[in-house]
Amino acid sequence: MGLSISKLFQSLFGKREMRILMVGLDAAGKTTILYKLKLGEIVTTIPTIGFNVETVEYRNISFTVWDVGGQDKIRPLWRHYFQNTQGIIFVVDSNDRERISEAHEELQRMLNEDELRDALLLVFANKQDLPNAMNAAEITDKLGLHSLRHRQWYIQATCATSGDGLYEGLEWLSTNLKNQ
């Protein structure tokens, strides 16, 4: 009896854990986003070779966020991070019109992986502060998000340097994690 009450208490008030894989093309802003969420400030970044991992606390959820480098030569390594991933944050440079089709190809390739079949998908349409940035609707179209069947997804316009939109994205992840 005491054990079931403690399990109920844990499910209502306890901290949940969620493993997040944050990927996207190089220079999309993944590392800037990670440290803006973790530290609340902008850090000077260099291209990520390998990964950064940090725990971000939000709404009784402990997000373990794996920020994996996006250069084309190391994208094949992304698959080594797929196991036990509950959520994907795919970061897009909204100002990079020349590589949006490349981002689409990488996203589709990743979503076809069986290990990620149940993972939530959050797309951060980053760099919205730039004057020629594509809006979330245009990125939704160019990434083919409406054609995704049997997958929960959401797109959030963001600006990593100001933090705009980042917590709205985590809010969506936390709400949908609870529904899984």
Swiss-Prot record:
Q: Where is the lipid attached (N-myristoyl glycine)?
A: G2
What EC number(s) does the entry state? 3.6.5.2
Could you tell me what reaction this enzyme catalyses?
GTP + H2O = GDP + phosphate + H(+)
Q: Which SMART domains match?
A: ARF, RAB, SAR
UniProt GO BP: endoplasmic reticulum to Golgi vesicle-mediated transport; intracellular protein transport; vesicle-mediated transport
Stored InterPro entries: Arf1-5-like, P-loop_NTPase, Small_GTP-bd, Small_GTPase_ARF, Small_GTPase_ARF/SAR
Which keywords has UniProt assigned to this entry?
Answer: ER-Golgi transport, Golgi apparatus, GTP-binding, Hydrolase, Lipoprotein, Myristate, Nucleotide-binding, Protein transport, Transport
The yes or no answer to whether the keyword Cytoplasm is present is no
Protein's UniProt keywords contain GTP-binding: yes
Q: Name one GO cellular component term.
A: cytoplasm
Q: What GO molecular function terms would the record report? A: GTP binding; GTPase activity
Q: Which Gene3D superfamilies match?
A: P-loop containing nucleotide triphosphate hydrolases (3.40.50.300)
Chain sites annotated for binding GTP: 24-31, 67-71, 126-129
Query: SUPFAM superfamilies from the entry?
Result: P-loop containing nucleoside triphosphate hydrolases
Tell me the compartments it is located in. Answer: Golgi apparatus
State the family named in the UniProt similarity comment for this chain: Belongs to the small GTPase superfamily. Arf family.
What is the role of the protein in this entry?
A: GTP-binding protein involved in protein trafficking; may modulate vesicle budding and uncoating within the Golgi apparatus.
This chain belongs to the protein called ADP-ribosylation factor 1
**Native source organism of the sequence:** Schizosaccharomyces pombe (strain 972 / ATCC 24843) (Fission yeast)
What gene is this protein a product of?
Answer: arf1
